[in-house]
Amino acid sequence: MLVGLDIGRQYIKVVAMNKIKDGYKIIDAGQRLVPDPNQAFDPDKIDTHHWVMAIKELIRQQNMNPKKIKLMATGISGSSASVKQITTMEMPSEELESAMTFEARKHIPMDGTDAVIDYQILGSNDKEVDKIDVVLVACTKGVLNSHIDLLNESGLKPGVIDVDPIAITNAFT
């Protein structure tokens, strides 16, 4: 069973799927109001206990067994992460990794010492030869660790943690 979990401003949403011959089949989906609708999910300021209980209740309500989840995918909200598309020179993957760290510090407004940086190559640039389009993503280690801790305390093992604005794209690649 593959499970997607979205911790939103008003609802916690979950969808469970099984892989079938031609793709995926949704086997269950549900949502639950957040513990306190006046308190948006902020990893630095939340009362973890209430959020853990809400996630556990949603999983129980949907009759999902955390032990049967093969892959858990979840996202960090756009307000807790930065996303930027850039164009850069095409280069070997080893060089690209260090170049992306440099580019992220240049383009994404975050303290580089506390940032977790990732990137995804979109493909060749249509307008410039020998250049590629890349999406840079960054969040703080604190945000990422809070998200992982929340999932672990809820009895879930995170497999994929994405950034909400690009999660849907990555779900199908």
Could you say what each language-model-derived stretch is?
Residues I55-L71, S154:
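Phosphate/pyrophosphate-binding loops at sites that engage ATP/ADP/AMP, CoA/4′-phosphopantetheine
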Residues L71, G75-T173:
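Active-site neighborhood for divalent-cation/phosphate handling
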Residues M1-L33, K70-G75, T173:
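Gly/Thr-rich phosphate-binding beta-strand-loop-beta motif of the actin/hexokinase/Hsp70
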